[in-house]
């Protein structure tokens, strides 16, 4: 029963007894539905960013945060038209905890689902998902092709350029910052720092 844990204190929802997968189990499930290396790397980046913030704000539940990041786009490659809908079905079929399912689905709030980010962790996922893509695209324009020497100012400049990485929703990023009560500049700086902490591990 080592994978059945209580995260009730974290979610303020009482005792939770659904299955919380290990990171390895989650990766295996992710690869069952995703083969594109870009999608797999994005999942690892968002997972790493979530872990970075968890160590600051919720150190007792770092792996839970990382799992939410890893699985957030579980259905995107095979079911793009049902994104954040199909993944709920898949996770329920595997007996995953409803708290994890809610966290994963909530990053599609007002885009594909009406599952609202309620907890701080869910708001972090919602706010940083699109932003990691923008930062990654900005890094590729940098001479070093890496986030290592990137500045928040450079990211903010690209944020303002509507034609750059147009698939990264500026509205979602702004809304995420508002949900967290952070300024846009603060969100950019913190997320960039998170990605820089992962530069060696994920070759960013």
Model segments located where?
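Cationic, low-complexity basic patches in intrinsically disordered or flexible, solvent-exposed regions
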Residues: 3
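Short, Lys/Arg-enriched N-terminal segments with co-localized hydrophobic residues
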Residues: 6-16
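Acidic/His-rich, divalent-metal-binding segments that scaffold phosphate/diphosphate chemistry
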Residues: 16-79
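Conserved active-site and cofactor/substrate-binding residues in soluble primary-metabolism enzymes
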Residues: 21, 41-45, 82, 119, ...
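Predominant activation on well-ordered alpha-helical scaffold segments within soluble catalytic domains
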Residues: 31, 44-47, 51, 85-88, ...
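Divalent metal-dependent catalytic cores for phosphoryl transfer on phosphate-bearing substrates
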Residues: 60-164, 174
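A structured, mid-to-C-terminal "fold-capping" secondary-structure block
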Residues: 154-204
